[in-house]
């Protein structure tokens, strides 16, 4: 039986079409995925992300532990509330999960991990935390709502009290603050400004209803996927998994190579991969009729005349741009164009950076 978040009843009241998403009953859409997508790009939309797992880590050696556990370096986190995006790797350099880590105090950090990887993540973290004496608390008492879009912060702020409004005033991206019952973070998965707000389960439904009344549109998994793909954001299990290097998933920027003497899980394997080269993640744009879909082959000829084949990891029709876009993992040597096989047709595509839309505007 699939689990329900504390907002399940609100979704059904809002007319959601519910689907099983990695063991959770989640809204796919509330009538129109396209309308929900546009609401986030032009105004404000919200997502139930309570299926994600919040893990609190406490102990005097927490920073030391996370410097070993994660490919990015939490030594960069010096201001309370600052967050960092990182891969959590296995010994062969594959991605166990991608996550966000928040720093509060020297002995208190918070992780937010994916729902699909929850059990293996918790097992991995627990196993490696033991020698460091870390106290691990899984915050199943908290729900999480992401409010995203150009007007999202202003609309969400109408629900905050004076102290909460003051706490978030001028807060830069990738920060989080505990203000009363709310943990408010300037993070998201859409390429728009907004907040991800964690709050006690028993208060989630009232907060959701108040956001609806404030003019924030409920949005489902469908719009979440088209928004994140336009923004060039990876989805675990598609752009990366335990067999794929972060170097092949456009996550090279999340690997902190310096200081050279920091030992983190997967470092040795990554250094070999960096030396020998890996595949890379690119963007694809197809303005002709048709839709680029996951797992379609991508073919190209390199400058030396050699033929290569890659694969689309995520593809969709972009509601913002009005044509099809995709992320693809391909061998080195790809030029500005490639061919994608769609059924029995060979379709020309333009090769771009793996990001298409930022703050409502085309990048590609």
Swiss-Prot record:
Q: Which Gene3D superfamilies match?
A: Aminomethyltransferase beta-barrel domains (3.30.70.1400), Aminomethyltransferase fragment (4.10.1250.10), Probable tRNA modification gtpase trme, domain 1 (3.30.1360.120)
Instruction: Tell me the superkingdom of the source.
Output: Bacteria
Give the reaction(s) catalysed. N(6)-[(R)-S(8)-aminomethyldihydrolipoyl]-L-lysyl-[protein] + (6S)-5,6,7,8-tetrahydrofolate = N(6)-[(R)-dihydrolipoyl]-L-lysyl-[protein] + (6R)-5,10-methylene-5,6,7,8-tetrahydrofolate + NH4(+)
Q: Which GO terms describe its molecular function?
A: aminomethyltransferase activity; transaminase activity
NCBIfam families, A to Z: gcvT (TIGR00528), PRK00389.1 (NF001567)
**Functional note:** The glycine cleavage system catalyzes the degradation of glycine.
Q: Which family does it belong to?
A: Belongs to the GcvT family.
PANTHER family per the UniProt record, alphabetical: AMINOMETHYLTRANSFERASE, AMINOMETHYLTRANSFERASE, MITOCHONDRIAL
Q: What is this protein called?
A: Aminomethyltransferase
Species assigned in the record: Escherichia coli (strain K12)
């Amino acid at each position: 039986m699939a689990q329900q978040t504390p907002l399940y009843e609100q979704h059904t009241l809002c007319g959601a079409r519910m689907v099983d998403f990695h063991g959770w009953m989640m809204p796919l859409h509330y009538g129109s995925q396209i309308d929900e997508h546009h609401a986030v790009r032009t105004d404000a939309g919200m997502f139930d992300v309570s299926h994600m797992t919040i893990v609190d880590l406490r102990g005097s050696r927490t920073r030391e532990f996370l410097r070993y556990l994660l490919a990015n370096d939490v030594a960069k986190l010096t201001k309370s509330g600052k967050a960092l995006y990182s891969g959590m790797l296995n010994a062969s350099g594959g991605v166990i999960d991608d996550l966000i880590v928040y720093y509060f105090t020297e002995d208190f950090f918070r992780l937010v991990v994916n729902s699909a990887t929850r059990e293996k993540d918790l097992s991995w973290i627990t196993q490696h935390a033991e020698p460091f004496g870390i106290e691990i608390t899984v915050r199943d008492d908290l729900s999480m709502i992401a409010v995203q879009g150009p007007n999202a912060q202003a609309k969400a702020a109408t629900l905050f009290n004076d102290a909460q409004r003051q706490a978030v005033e001028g807060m830069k991206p990738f920060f989080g603050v505990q203000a009363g019952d709310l943990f408010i973070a300037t993070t998201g998965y859409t390429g728009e400004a907004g907040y991800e707000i964690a709050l006690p389960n028993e208060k989630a439904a009232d907060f959701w209803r108040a956001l609806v009344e404030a003019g924030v549109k409920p949005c489902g998994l469908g719009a979440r996927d088209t928004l994140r793909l336009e923004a060039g954001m990876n989805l675990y299990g598609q752009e990366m998994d335990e067999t794929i290097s972060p170097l092949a998933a456009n996550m090279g920027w999340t690997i902190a190579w310096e200081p050279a003497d920091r030992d983190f899980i997967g470092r040795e394997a990554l250094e070999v991969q960096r030396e020998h080269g890996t595949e890379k993640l690119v963007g694809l744009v197809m303005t002709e009729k048709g839709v680029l879909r996951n797992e379609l082959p991508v073919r190209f000829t390199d400058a030396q005349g050699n033929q290569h084949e890659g694969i689309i990891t995520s593809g969709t029709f972009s509601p913002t741009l009005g044509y099809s876009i995709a992320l693809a993992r391909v061998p080195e040597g790809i030029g500005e164009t490639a061919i994608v096989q769609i059924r029995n047709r060979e379709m020309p595509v333009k090769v771009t950076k793996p990001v298409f839309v930022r703050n409502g505007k085309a990048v590609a």
